[in-house]
Amino acid sequence: QIIKMLSLSRFPQNLLVSRCFSSCCSWPGLSQWRNAPINSNRLWGDTSPQYQSLPSLPNDHPGYVKLLRASSLSELGAIALSTGFHPAPPPSRPEKPVLVSPKDIPSPKECGIPLNAYMLHNLAHVELNAIDLAWDTVVRFSKLHDAIGEGFFEDFARVADDESRHFAWCSQRLGELGYSYGDMPAHNVLWRECEKSSDDVAARLAVIPLVQEARGLDAGPRLVRKLVGFGDSRTSKIVAQIADEEVPHVAVGVHWFVAICEKTGCAPSSTFHALLKQHQVVPKGPFNFAARDEAGIPRDWYENEDSVNAHQLAPVRERLSDIISLEMENAT
């Protein structure tokens, strides 16, 4: 019954085993992250996050609805985790940014936006999508509440809360640089990846936390170095903090993916590879092995000979990429 509910019954039978599970190392900080109070450090101070109280507004104030949308729904207690409603695809979006194909995203020079603001805008777009992805996971799979357990939904509500702070920091810093979210076009790739896994909770975990969010572990340090090279240490500190806080999001994905595999008698490693093949998703390096190891993703889930070679060449490629980016900016 559970296999049918989780849409795992279509897996090849040779993936169904009793206890042949890949060895996964849980992130040591997972319990502390779960038990911590809601983080209200939504303002970026001189060098680190700072507490920001929510303003008190009357219900008829024009900013009230905006406040509710921007704030943590888990903090406001505005969602029932056992709801049976389905989220309406796609989620609501502001008029800007205009969504275009990835190949049509303009360069910093074409946008007339400096490189640091350009990269920060891209990150803000990722964080906004991450909020929607987390809440979509909570609502879309709420029908499995009894089978999975309430902890699953509490974890992803907390992920959404984290992502809302990250978006707030990015938006604040964009404003300090003289820009705002929506000042350049963006793509809709992340939401399309979400739609691929809309009918299968195991696929959702494989595609989103274990591939898409794991890419943030890989890209974060590279982005920090580029910003430092550009001379924007303030933005680099924001990005470094965001990258650190992505580790528990990936760790949550690992935990629940393995838990669901255990419930259904599936080998996590084989199931992960089968799901990625089914949904035509390919993990792309170079990988940040240290951060991925910390989050608990077994290397055999994503590593192959090509990725090992890419990892060895990564420092050279990253340095060249940094030099090219800075030269392009100087040329403008």
Task: Give the predicted meaning of each segment.
Residues 1-4:
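Short, Lys/Arg-enriched N-terminal segments with co-localized hydrophobic residues
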